């Protein structure tokens, strides 16, 4: 049985899981002391983390791990491969207790261009700072082998471990090997390939490894055309295959880029409740190894520039960062010793800034969801403020009233009014109206009658008036409501309209005279609220209309039977619920309710219907 603290922790964790994004990323589990005890990657963060808490685990590591979780952090990335690389970096950095299978410091391989007179190129898992160049790491090994194979086919490179110094080559210490005879090596060991020619190939290879393949591709196209002009189609086809390999090759990752080292990245987002969120990423040796988002509560209406400056100072102090470059989203009036501030517009640094912005926006959205779950009224007020801003109202529309008509060719004409208070339906305030003064199908006249009756009475009884009236219809409905509200009753109540598309779905919000379309995203919470209001008034009106029509039909069927009074009708409808069921019932079943004589009368009367 869970203790009270455990129950609170479980509720807190469920809240985090419920708001996780369905995006690739890395998640971190922390214990009660704030220590990271597990790091994992996911193609879909929400599904992966949810799986830990949605079932009973068998006794063992996973069950123990779940029991130790007190908090969850996560970092959003753009691809599953990025998540793999980031997971690897974080596991090596924090060495979490429950990542036992990944604690051997095994890392993803990189491609090394060795710092030698005639450089060798090979894959390695060790980064040695001896002037060599490293590209990667590669989490997808087939991609790495494809690149190495491409290089092998494009350029004849040495693969031996010989010390090919100028002195040793001049001394004639070496002989060509099999690689030379099968044309996989040009024989630099015996002076058959010059140092300059070899390094020219190395420079081109480095461009391929960096992903800068445009010049290489252009060179291959020219070579391919040359061979084709010389009628050497077989060789041209081989060059074409190499060209296609290069074009399809993508060697860089957004999360890990070997050209970036010791850089801090910051971004900031604000909300409407005096909060600001700052995201911090730290890049070391081409990889993200720190990621953190935190919240500031404004006290003196500080600007984004002031808050971001505070965040930079605090994070660099907390994580002991000595980065010489800081990437930020906008210019800052901040000077730090030996530090350059960069506002990137393109390239790898811009991708890192975009990744930071992605994380801070996601964090902001998650905090908003959590706050609104704990305090639903906060969500309601946010939506009402959105309506206020979109329609330029003087105040949030705390009380919204919406009208709709319902009839079939003018028969059984009714109308309905639903009331939403603080963005929630207030069903005790709903009202139904039988149309009294309109003959035939006239929606505009019916709307005028109902609006007039409702607000004349509100004025007479000194009842609260709505902050916004919404009509279930377009410009015509809005205009007839305006005529009653402004011209007849001399009231000042904003009027909006909800128009539907040809599939009878809410499509747009109209406001103003003449009416203008207010652009609202159909996936937004505000649009869903407006759709809810329109669906609710339609449901309420049509249900009332059906009930009225049904009662009229029932009344006419039983009223036409002589000798059957109100008491008998009530007894029959109470038992059988409808005229149709009375018709289907046997004589004996009806007789049990009203006696045999009346039962025969009813049976005979309904059979003539």
UniProtKB/Swiss-Prot annotation:
Q: Which SMART domains match?
A: GIYc
Q: Which Gene3D superfamilies match?
A: 5' to 3' exonuclease, C-terminal subdomain, GIY-YIG endonuclease, UvrC, RNAse H endonuclease domain
Q: Which Pfam families match?
A: GIY-YIG, HHH_5, UvrC_RNaseH, UvrC_RNaseH_dom
> Which keywords does UniProt give here?
Cytoplasm, DNA damage, DNA excision, DNA repair, Excision nuclease, SOS response
Domain (GIY-YIG) ranges? 22-100
* TM segment ranges: none
- Kindly give the PANTHER family that the UniProt entry links to this protein: UVRABC SYSTEM PROTEIN C, UVRC/OXIDOREDUCTASE
Its family?
Answer: Belongs to the UvrC family.
Oligomeric state and interaction partners are given as: Interacts with UvrB in an incision complex.
Q: What is this protein called?
A: UvrABC system protein C
Q: Which organism is it from?
A: Bacteroides thetaiotaomicron (strain ATCC 29148 / DSM 2079 / JCM 5827 / CCUG 10774 / NCTC 10582 / VPI-5482 / E50)
Question: What is the gene called?
Answer: uvrC
């Amino acid at each position: 049985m869970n203790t009270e603290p455990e129950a609170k922790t479980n509720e807190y964790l469920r809240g985090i899981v419920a708001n996780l994004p369905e995006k690739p990323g890395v998640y971190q589990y922390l214990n009660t002391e704030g220590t990271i005890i597990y790091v994992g990657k996911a193609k879909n963060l929400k599904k992966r983390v949810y799986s830990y808490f949605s079932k009973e685990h068998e006794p063992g590591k996973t069950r123990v791990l779940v029991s130790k979780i007190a908090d969850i952090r996560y970092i959003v990335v753009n691809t599953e491969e990025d998540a793999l690389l980031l997971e690897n970096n974080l596991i090596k950095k924090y060495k979490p207790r429950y990542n036992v299978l990944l604690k051997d410091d095994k890392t993803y391989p990189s491609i090394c261009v060795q710092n030698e007179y005639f450089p060798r190129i090979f894959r390695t898992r060790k980064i040695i700072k001896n002037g060599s160049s490293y590209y990667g790491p590669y989490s997808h090994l087939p991609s790495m082998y494809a690149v190495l194979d491409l290089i092998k086919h494009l350029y004849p490179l040495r693969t031996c471990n010989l010390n090919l110094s100028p002195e040793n080559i001049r001394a004639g210490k070496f002989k060509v090997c099999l690689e030379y005879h099968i044309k996989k090596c040009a024989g630099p060991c015996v002076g058959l390939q010059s140092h300059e020619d070899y390094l020219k190939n190395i420079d081109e290879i480095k461009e391929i490894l960096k992903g800068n393949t445009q010049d290489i591709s252009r060179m291959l196209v020219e070579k391919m055309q040359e061979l084709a002009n010389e009628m050497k189609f077989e060789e041209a086809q081989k060059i074409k295959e190499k060209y296609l390999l290069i074009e399809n090759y993508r060697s860089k990752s957004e999360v890990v880029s070997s050209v970036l080292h010791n850089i801090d990245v910051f971004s900031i987002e604000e909300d409407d409740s005096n909060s600001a969120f700052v995201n911090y990423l730290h890049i070391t040796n081409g990889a993200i190894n720190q990621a953190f988002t935190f919240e500031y509560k404004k006290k003196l209406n500080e600007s984004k520039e002031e808050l971001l400056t505070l965040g930079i100072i605090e994070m660099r102090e907390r994580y002991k960062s000595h980065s010489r470059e800081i990437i930020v989203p906008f210019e800052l009036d901040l000077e730090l010793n030996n530090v350059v501030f960069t506002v990137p517009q393109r390239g790898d640094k811009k991708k890192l800034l975009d990744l930071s912005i992605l994380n801070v926006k996601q964090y902001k959205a998650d905090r908003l969801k959590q706050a609104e779950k704990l305090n639903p009224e906060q969500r309601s007020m946010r939506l009402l403020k959105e309506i206020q801003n979109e329609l330029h109202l003087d105040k949030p529309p705390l009380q919204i009233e919406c009208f709709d008509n319902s009839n079939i060719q003018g028969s059984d004409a009714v109308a309905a009014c639903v009331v939403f208070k603080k963005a929630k339906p207030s069903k005790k305030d709903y009202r139904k109206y039988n149309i009294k003064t309109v003959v035939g199908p006239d929606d505009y006249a019916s709307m005028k009658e109902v609006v007039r009756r409702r607000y004349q009475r509100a004025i007479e009884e000194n009842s609260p008036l709505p902050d916004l009236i919404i009509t279930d219809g377009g410009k015509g409905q809005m205009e007839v409501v305006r005529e009653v509200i402004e011209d007849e009753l001399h009231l000042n109540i904003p009027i909006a309209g909800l128009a539907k598309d040809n599939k009878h779905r809410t499509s747009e919000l109209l406001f103003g005279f003449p009416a203008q379309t207010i652009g609202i995203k159909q996936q937004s919470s505000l649009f869903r609220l407006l759709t809810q209001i329109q669906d609710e008034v339609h449901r309420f009106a049509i249900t009332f209309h059906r009930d009225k029509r049904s009662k009229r039909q029932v009344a006419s069927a039983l009223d036409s039977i002589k000798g059957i009074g109100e008491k008998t009708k009530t007894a029959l409808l109470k038992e059988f619920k409808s005229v149709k069921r009375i018709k289907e019932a046997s004589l004996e079943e009806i007789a049990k309710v009203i006696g045999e004589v009346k039962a025969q009368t009813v049976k005979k009367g309904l059979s003539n219907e």
